[in-house]
Amino acid sequence: MRKVFETVVGLNPNFSFRGKQQTRIETFSDAVFALAITLLVLSSTIPETFEDLWASMRDVIPFAICVALIIVIWYQHYIFFLKYGLQDKVTILLNTILLFVLLVYVYPLKFLARFLSEIYGGIFGIIETDLSRFGEYSHQNLKLLMVNYGLGAFAIFLVFSLMYWRAYKMKSLLDLNSYEIFDTKSSIIANLLMCSVPLLSLIITLIDPWGNFRTTILSGFLYFLYVPIMIVFGRITSKKSRRLLQD
């Protein structure tokens, strides 16, 4: 199967993939990713009446958001092992931590997705907002929600950066060329940037400068920083990689 993927449009043609054979680490990891999506499904109750059915449809968008985020994490995991094929103890440890965080992260992620979907659905008139089903949405509860989400996002991208750092430390053993070393360094920085945004949001939430809902609103809007940060970083690395390939 991996030999087929080597020719698929979308993979980096300038990187020699070393993980051409799927390992037991990846097989186990894929099972955990599948379990994470299964937990999302099991967290929803089976509708028994028409009212329950229409109510369950409110969870379609939150479910789609959660599945999309899990697939993004899975894809980055897949690309890492496809590039390097590492099976050493440190990589296994980091991979285990990643999977643990993912499973812990599933329920807070779905809760946040449902909560935001309810709010924005009401703002744009898509659904009639009913926040009562979330219990007391006090400032302290929203802070706890933002802290849980921030810790999960920060931990996941930090682990990815450490995994790429491990690959970089083993560059001689992996026989990485100059472009592959640059690509590995870029992946380290990209994941550090990805974990810096939830870290900033987490710090603002814990400091709580206003002591009211404005803090959690700001903490949430900070995640929009992903767009300009990753666009700028992508352009910088793209220019450097083109120069490197031309030399």
Swiss-Prot record:
One of its GO terms (biological process) is potassium ion transmembrane transport. A motif (RxxxFSD motif) lies at residues 24-30. The record marks 35 as: Hydrophobic filter residue 1. The record marks 42 as: Hydrophobic filter residue 3. It catalyses: K(+)(in) = K(+)(out). Pfam families: TMEM175 (PF06736). One of its GO terms (cellular component) is plasma membrane. Keywords: Cell membrane, Ion channel, Ion transport, Membrane, Potassium, Potassium channel, Potassium transport, Transmembrane, Transmembrane helix, Transport. It is found in: Cell membrane. InterPro entries: TMEM175-like. The record marks 39 as: Hydrophobic filter residue 2. GO terms for molecular function: potassium ion leak channel activity; proton channel activity. The keyword Cell membrane applies. Its main location: membrane. Belongs to the TMEM175 family. Potassium channel; forms a potassium-permeable leak-like channel with weak selectivity for potassium. The channel is permeable for K(+), Rb(+) and Cs(+). The six transmembrane regions are tightly packed within each subunit without undergoing domain swapping. Transmembranes TM1-TM3 are positioned on the inner circle of the channel tetramer and participate in inter-subunit interactions that are central to the assembly of the ion conduction pore. The RxxxFSD motif within transmembrane TM1 coordinates a network of specific inter- and intra-subunit interactions with other conserved residues on TM2 and TM3 and plays a key role in the tetrameric assembly of the channel. This is Potassium channel Ftrac_2467. It comes from Marivirga tractuosa (strain ATCC 23168 / DSM 4126 / NBRC 15989 / NCIMB 1408 / VKM B-1430 / H-43) (Microscilla tractuosa).
